[in-house]
Swiss-Prot record:
Family: Belongs to the band 7/mec-2 family.
Biased composition (Low complexity): 11-50
Location of the region described as Disordered in the Swiss-Prot/TrEMBL record: 1-75
Keywords for the protein's UniProt record, in alphabetical order: Membrane, Transmembrane, Transmembrane helix
Organism listed in the record: Caenorhabditis elegans
Membrane topology reported for the UniProt record: Single-pass membrane protein
Record's subcellular location: Membrane
Function description: May be involved in cilia-related function.
Keyword Transmembrane helix: yes
SUPFAM superfamilies: Band 7/SPFH domain
Pfam families: Band_7 (PF01145)
Top-level taxonomic group: Eukaryota
Protein name: Stomatin-2
Length: 375
C-alpha cells in the first residue's frame, strides 16, 4: 500500500547551491521517483510503508545532479535507497577521472614516459619564453629566417623546449616554428634504410665453423621515440643485427643453414622487430646473403658428394643388369616353348652379322640340322 509523502520528505536539498543563480540559463527536467518500503526495522508482525521522493535534475549536457533527500528514512531498506545515489555519483566521478587520465596518456607515443614532455615550464621557463618572443618581435622580419623551418614529406622534426619534448609529437611535413635560444629540433628520416651485416664467424650446432652475412631493411616508425629513447638508433640496430645473427645461427646445424635460409631470415626478422620496437624502429625484411665454408670442409663435402654419385651410379647399373637378366630369362622360356621363335631369332642374328661385314657369306641352316650336329 502506497501513501502520499509529506512535503518535508519530498523537498530536495540541491548539491550545488552556488549554481542557483544560473538556473535561468539551464533547462532542467525533473523526474519524480517514488518507492515503498515494505520491510520493517526488524519486527516480524508489524508491517509499515515508507515512501520518499527525490528530484533528479539533468542539464543540457546530460550531467545528472542528485540532491540529498531531507527527512529521516525508516528501516534498513530506506537507508540503503537513500545512500545508493550518493555512492553511484561518487563511483561515476572516479570512473570519469580515470578515463580522463587514460585519455591524456593516450596522446603520448608508445614506449615514451610522460615525464619527458613539457608539462610545466615554471617561472624561469615562462620568463625565457617571454624574452624569446620579445627577441622575435623586435627583430622581425629578420627573425622569420631563423624561426621558420621546413621538413620534407619523408622527414619529421622532433622539437625540444628547454630540454623537454613539446606536446603534439613530431612536426611535419611542411613548415613549423622554432623559438630561438630555447627550442631545438632534430630531423628524422622515415625512409627505408638498408645495410649489410659484416660476415660473422659462427660455430654451428654440429661444431662446424662458417661465415655468414646478411642484409637488413628497416625504417623509423616513430620519430619521437627513436630520438628520445636511444642515442643512435641506426648504429644500435646494426650492432643488434650482428649479435642476433650470431646467436640465432649458433643454435642451428650446417644443413639447416644451407637449406632453410628463408625460415631463418623470417625468425631473425621477428626477433629484431620485437627488440627494436621500443626504439621506434620497424624491421621490414631480412635476407641471408652468403654462407662461406672453410676450404678443407669444401673439399670434404665435394669428395662426399662424388662418392655419393658413384655409389648411386653403381646401384643404377646393378639394377639395370638385374632387369636385363630377368628379361633374358623370360625370353628363354618363351623360345623354349616355341621352336619357330628360336629360328626367327637365329635369322635375325645372321642378318645383323651380315650387315656389318658385306664380304661375309652366310648360309643359314635349319635348326633341326644344327641340333643334330650339336648332339
Amino acid at each position: 500500500m502506497k501513501t502520499q509523502p509529506s512535503e518535508e520528505s519530498a523537498s530536495p536539498a540541491p548539491v550545488n547551491p552556488g549554481n542557483s543563480g544560473n538556473s535561468g540559463n539551464r533547462r532542467a527536467s525533473s523526474t519524480r521517483i517514488s518507492f515503498s518500503d515494505q520491510l520493517d526495522g526488524g519486527d516480524s508482525g508489524d508491517s509499515s510503508s515508507n515512501e520518499s521522493e527525490r528530484l533528479m535534475e539533468s542539464d543540457d549536457e546530460g550531467n545528472i545532479q542528485i540532491p540529498v533527500p531531507t527527512g529521516q528514512p525508516r528501516g534498513r531498506m530506506g537507508r540503503r535507497f537513500t545512500l545508493n545515489p550518493l555512492i553511484f555519483a561518487k563511483e561515476e566521478r572516479e570512473a570519469r577521472r580515470q578515463s580522463l587520465a587514460q585519455l591524456k596518456l593516450s596522446y603520448y607515443p608508445k614506449h615514451m614516459n610522460p615525464e619527458h614532455y613539457d608539462t610545466g615550464l615554471g617561472f624561469c621557463g615562462w620568463f625565457l619564453m617571454g624574452l624569446s618572443w620579445i627577441m622575435v618581435i623586435s627583430t622581425f622580419p629578420v627573425s622569420i629566417y631563423f624561426c621558420m623551418k621546413v621538413v620534407q614529406e619523408y622527414e619529421r622534426a622532433v622539437i625540444f623546449r628547454l630540454g623537454r619534448l613539446i606536446g603534439g609529437g613530431a612536426k611535419g611535413p611542411g613548415i613549423f616554428f622554432v623559438l630561438p635560444c630555447i627550442e631545438s629540433y632534430t630531423k628524422v628520416d622515415l625512409r627505408t634504410v638498408s645495410f649489410s651485416v659484416p660476415p660473422q664467424e659462427i660455430l654451428t650446432k654440429d661444431s662446424v665453423t662458417t661465415s655468414v652475412d646478411a642484409v637488413i631493411y628497416y625504417r623509423i616508425s616513430n620519430a619521437t621515440v627513436s630520438v628520445a629513447n636511444v642515442e643512435n638508433a641506426h648504429h644500435s640496430t646494426r650492432l643488434l643485427a650482428q649479435t642476433t645473427l650470431r646467436n640465432m645461427l649458433g643454435t642451428r646445424s650446417l644443413s639447416e643453414i644451407l637449406s632453410d635460409r628463408e625460415t631463418l631470415a623470417a625468425s631473425m626478422q621477428t626477433i629484431l622487430d620485437e627488440a627494436t620496437e621500443s626504439w621506434g624502429i620497424k624491421v621490414e625484411r631480412v635476407e641471408i646473403k652468403d654462407v662461406r665454408l672453410p676450404i678443407q670442409l669444401q673439399r670434404a663435402m665435394a669428395a662426399e658428394a662424388e662418392a655419393t654419385r658413384e655409389a648411386r651410379a653403381k646401384v643404377i647399373a646393378a639394377e639395370g643388369e638385374q632387369k636385363a637378366s630377368r628379361a633374358l630369362r623370360d625370353a628363354a622360356s618363351v623360345i623354349a616353348q616355341s621352336p619357330a621363335a628360336l629360328q626367327l631369332r637365329y635369322l635375325q642374328t645372321l642378318n645383323s652379322v651380315a650387315a656389318e661385314k658385306n664380304s661375309t657369306i652366310i648360309f643359314p641352316l635349319p635348326m633341326e640340322l644344327v641340333r643334330h650336329l650339336i648332339n
